[in-house]
């Protein structure tokens, strides 16, 4: 979990193809053959995410904002691209050409990117009264919000999106 999904990689003997492409691991398998131990890294976030979001996608869901740039966001980015969506990262600071800051989220960007995935810990218990700082007033019923957080059941991010009609 945060931030060890990336930091553990140098200690592993092997990565499966998805974990290697993503650059993050959340499952480690210990394989012992003829007295030799081998640690293999996998990423189950990819499969869990793509299988859960794919049925929710509509033809107008072509572009996605990924909130956060940690290990989980890498799996989400890989999964969204596998599903044919163009992605843009949102972070507190600009890292590269494929990243914007929260302050740079204009109504035009919000209108263009109809899928928004929260990959940050913002809003997780015990700070359930917080949420990522996006312009929620720009959300519409065509927007699909997805939160990786599981505690609380309904995060403030999801509630504020729902209040604007987002799914």
Task: Cite the ranges covered by each PLM segment.
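Short, well-ordered alpha-helices that flank and scaffold nucleotide-derived cofactor binding pockets
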Residues: 10-13, 51, 55, 78, ...
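Glycine-rich adenosine-cofactor-binding loop
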Residues: 43-46, 53, 62-81
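Active-site glycine-rich loop that binds ribose-phosphate moieties when present
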Residues: 48-59, 71, 98-104
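Short helix-loop-beta connector
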Residues: 57-63, 140-141
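Rossmann-like adenosine-cofactor binding region
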Residues: 97-167
């Amino acid at each position: 979990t945060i931030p060890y999904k990336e930091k553990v990689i140098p200690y592993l003997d092997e990565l499966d193809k998805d974990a290697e492409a993503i650059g993050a691991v959340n499952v480690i398998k210990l394989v012992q053959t003829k007295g030799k131990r081998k640690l293999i890294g996998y990423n189950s976030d990819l499969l869990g995410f793509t299988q859960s979001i794919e049925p929710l996608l509509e033809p107008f869901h072509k572009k996605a904002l990924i909130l956060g740039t940690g290990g989980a966001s890498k799996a989400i980015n890989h999964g969204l691209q596998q599903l044919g969506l163009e992605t843009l990262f949102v972070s507190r600071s600009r890292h590269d050409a494929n990243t914007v800051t929260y302050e740079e989220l204009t109504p035009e960007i919000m209108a263009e990117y109809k899928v928004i995935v929260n990959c940050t810990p913002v809003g997780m218990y015990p700070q359930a009264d917080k949420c990522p700082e996006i312009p929620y007033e720009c959300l519409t019923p065509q927007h699909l919000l997805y939160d990786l957080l599981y505690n609380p059941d309904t995060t403030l991010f999801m509630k504020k999106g729902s209040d604007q009609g987002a799914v």
